[in-house]
Amino acid sequence: MSVQPVFSPEVAKRNGFDFLRLFFAFSVFMAHFGELASISVWWPVSSAMGVAGFFIISGFLITRSYYRSAGLRDYCLKRIRRIVPAYVLVVVACALLLSLVSTLPAQAYFTDKDFYTYLVANLSFMNFLQPVLPGVFTDNAFPYINGALWTIKVELALYAFVPLLALFLRRRPGFVLGTVYVLSCLFDHTMSFLYESSGNELYLILERQFLGQIRFFVAGIVLLFYFDFITKRHVRWLLPGAAIIFLLRYFFIGHWMIEPVYPIAFAVLIVSFACYFGKLAVVSRYGDFSYGFYLYHYPVIQLFLCVDWMRNHPACLFLICFCTVSGLACLSWHLLEKRILRRNASQERQQP
């Protein structure tokens, strides 16, 4: 029997997903601010949890977008238009503008092979090949230009996985989703075990890549396919159960009994929150700033640390960084992201 994703029109129009994405982006900002500035910052949501939340929401919304698209080409173009323009902007802008704070003279900077390697590697979403620019942020605690970009290649891989996964979801979605989920959990557990046994950070890096993160994405898809079953028929016991699992994992990170069910529990909490707090949709009226906030926050923090502004005044440094990132995110949305999305939507309506 075929099962199709269900998502009521009322919830589609009024939900808190944009608010949650902004919240998770801010959580990643908080974690990176503390790490880069070597400041102890307390925030209830870690960067890993924020990224996991992003992937869960993506699994839910992007899969829904695929089923609502006119075809594979339409789906791919939508994903490219949403992700690529702002990504290219932040990579190119950092490469050009950060020459102003490089320890190298302009001529040496722009003729250095690392400058071009950075552009090629990062524009190819292979950030790990060249995460630094010549002479930039060399006196910071970490010399990386944008340590947040590693998730974008994972996100794109997950987007590409959706059409392939959809081929197998036509008849036995529960079995297929369950199989992919379990395999991802096994991969995550194996990489964690190997890292703890050997101390080799390669296993930790592999754990954070596509195969380890797909469990969160699939958890979001599960909530989409069984939306009514989970959020309406059985929410009375599923929601408290998910909350208990989430809290246990929060206070006992990495326990082998909790880790396999944590993504599903987190997904239940996220989707339930987004659907039952529809008033938070007011955030969407002003724009979807979460992507820009996520893209720009890391280099902004690094830049202010590099020029040594307010380093001895953490609260002022935080406010300056937050306001700058927020401003860039707003400008990026209104001047670039929204215009591209709106222009292409208009072109699609004009096509016969």
Segments predicted by a language model, with ranges:
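Interfacial loop-to-helix transition and helix-capping segments at the boundaries
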Residues: A12-F17, I39-V51, A141-V154, T190-F216, ...
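Aromatic-anchored segments of alpha-helical transmembrane domains
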Residues: F26-F33, Y181-L194, G241-I253, Y296-L303
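Functionally critical transmembrane alpha-helices in membrane proteins and complexes, commonly lining
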Residues: A12-Y67, V84-V88, L211, A274, ...
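Alpha-helical transmembrane segments of multi-pass integral membrane proteins
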Residues: I244-K338
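Short, Lys/Arg-rich, polar N-terminal cytosolic tail immediately upstream
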Residues: M1-R14
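Solvent-exposed interhelical
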Residues: L156-C185, L224-W237, M310-P314
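Transmembrane alpha-helical segments and their boundary/interface "anchor" motifs
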Residues: A48-V51, Y66-L104, A108-F125, L158, ...
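Membrane-interface helix-loop-helix regions
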Residues: V88-V154, Y262-L269, F273
